[in-house]
Amino acid sequence: MKVLWAALVVTLLAGCQADVEREPEVQLGNEWAKWQAGQPWEQALGRFWNYLRWVQTLSDQVQEELLSTQATQELTVLIEETMKEVKTYKAELEQQLGPMAQETQARVSKELQAAQARLGADMEDVRNRLVQYRSELQAMMGQSTEELRGRLNSHLRKLRKRLLRDAEDLQKRLAVYQAGIREGAERSVNTLRERLGPLVEQAATVRSLVSKPLQERAEAWGQRLRGRLEKVGIQAGDRLDEVREQVQEVRAKVEEQANQMRLQAEAFHARLKSWFEPLVQDMQQRWAELVEKVQLAVGTSPTSESSEKQ
């Protein structure tokens, strides 16, 4: 999206002066190729990079293409593909959190749906901001380039803050989910022990009241019951450890993806800044040359008129 804005800025500024050289095509190299393989969401990100690269290869038609609805339509398709991959990942996450209690699982599913809705709203906001920013650029043709650069830098800072805030919020939610899963599993084990405890005591009472053969049977039955109880406790503990490991794996994946998003945002900010600053400096130099030419032309005009009168 930032590259799309940069291409739009280059095109509009180039249209202000006829003798300005065209911006050379930005070569992304192998940076996009690494997203073609891997998880589905990585492939969707690769298609997004491919679209940005295509925008950069436009020359004479770039202004007409960007000012039309084509860019918005292409962005809509990318949003739909990304949301589809998000839904798939959400279903996979819910499957990994399946052993939780139904009440907790329903709450987790509801919160994940809310997070998904916020993500869709953010992407729609990006698309709407593109349309709004495109209109603002058309109205800023006569204003200072410093103001334009300041607006771009401000938007990039806000985008990075939003990514960091969303990543931290997701980490906190995962910590809450892990604590809820552990508490629910421990509560289930305690409930099971409370239900089986009276049965063990009842077996001991029967054993003391009956004769020796019956007492031996009751003792054997009590031993089997205790063995089953211990087995159930061990299984419940193993299940709790398994659930805890699954939650830790999910949390590690999310933290890794959040770190990748942060690094990509920082690299994107530095790359856009390195592209835009040379353009602004070149425009300032050309503007100074144009002002100097106009001043020279104004200074020589009275001299020419005096020569013609003589």
Swiss-Prot record:
Residues 77-248 are annotated as: 8 X 22 AA approximate tandem repeats. Transmembrane segments: none annotated. Residues 155-165 are annotated as: LDL and other lipoprotein receptors binding. GO terms for molecular function: cholesterol transfer activity; heparin binding; phosphatidylcholine-sterol O-acyltransferase activator activity; phospholipid binding. Coiled coil: none annotated. Homotetramer. May interact with ABCA1; functionally associated with ABCA1 in the biogenesis of HDLs. May interact with APP/A4 amyloid-beta peptide; the interaction is extremely stable in vitro but its physiological significance is unclear. May interact with MAPT. May interact with MAP2. In the cerebrospinal fluid, interacts with secreted SORL1. Interacts with PMEL; this allows the loading of PMEL luminal fragment on ILVs to induce fibril nucleation. APOE is an apolipoprotein, a protein associating with lipid particles, that mainly functions in lipoprotein-mediated lipid transport between organs via the plasma and interstitial fluids. APOE is a core component of plasma lipoproteins and is involved in their production, conversion and clearance. Apolipoproteins are amphipathic molecules that interact both with lipids of the lipoprotein particle core and the aqueous environment of the plasma. This is Apolipoprotein E. It comes from Tapirus indicus.
